């Protein structure tokens, strides 16, 4: 007698995606990715990080399932919902966003660090299986500020006392 762990698509995965407003169901029963209005005020790389964190969480949770490869469709829906969110933010099409952020065969969003420019790309199911998609780099806290940390540091104003042009760390 064999015991197999399978992924509960309808009970858990679809409920998760409807709760997060990642997809909607068409009249013919197919799923269509939609943009998430709650993420429009974030920077592009933060939007990708948010989607990656959610996708990695589910992929890691169901990592031992025998039908793990079926999560590929889930990752596809998450990626295109992410693209639709970024496209909606910039009031453009998905095709233009992919062209703008093209990086080889896939797309990735650049962001600045102290050591230079890095890129964040959407997570794929193969990354989760190999363990490459761990949360080591992207440990950001969730804030609802309209400005990014880069904009606040470039303003050269101390957020604590309000003095200007001081050497800020």
Regions found by a protein language model. Give the residues of each.
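Non-catalytic terminal/accessory segments
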Residues: 1-169
């Amino acid at each position: 007698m064999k015991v197999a762990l399978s992924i509960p698509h309808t009970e858990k995965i679809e409920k998760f995606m409807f709760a997060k407003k990642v997809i909607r169901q068409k009249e013919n029963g197919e799923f269509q990715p939609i943009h998430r209005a709650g993420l429009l005020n974030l920077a592009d790389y933060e939007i990708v990080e948010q989607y990656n964190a959610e996708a990695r969480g589910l992929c890691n949770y169901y990592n031992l399932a025998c039908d793990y490869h079926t999560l590929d469709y889930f990752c596809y829906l998450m990626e295109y919902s992410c693209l639709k969110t970024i496209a909606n933010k910039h009031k453009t099409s998905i095709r233009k966003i992919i062209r703008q952020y093209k990086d080889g065969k896939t797309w990735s969003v650049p962001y600045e660090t102290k050591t230079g420019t890095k890129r964040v790309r959407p997570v794929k199911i193969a990354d989760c299986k190999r363990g490459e998609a761990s949360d080591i780099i992207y440990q950001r806290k969730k804030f609802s500020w309209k400005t990014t940390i880069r904009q606040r540091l470039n303003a050269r104003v101390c957020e604590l006392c309000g003095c200007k042009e001081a050497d800020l760390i």
